[in-house]
Amino acid sequence: MSVKVLYKTTATATGGRDGTASTADGAFSVKLATPKELGGCGGAGNNPEQLFAAGYAACFIGAMKAVAAQGGGVKVPADASVTSTVGIGPRSEGGFGLDIDLADSLPGLARADAEALVEKAHHVCPYSNATRGNVDVRLTVV
């Protein structure tokens, strides 16, 4: 696979799930905390699954806009939203894996148009391409 890189970013984490993470440019810094469900104290802070969910949701809206801009005959509504729900748990093959639901809200679009846009975006979105074949991702138009 070949990618013509247009943008790169660098982030560093220290302390694992109970540490901190920040980007090299200083634009983003976050305190991390392990959820109770994963054996942590569930204290103040975010976890990798939350960060992944936020990133995937934002990226998927961008993918829908890119598809629409290519002349798909539809426009992504200004109030469109994507709700990404990311679960984590043990895999039957060993190790841990993710399980993802993307609920796409496209007010004002006909259901068939919305579903077609979401399906096309799923083939454009970098997160979708990174997870394809490795993670169960369910798409729903709400």
Show where each model-derived region lies.
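Extended beta-strand/beta-hairpin segments
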Residues: M1-A54, I61-V142
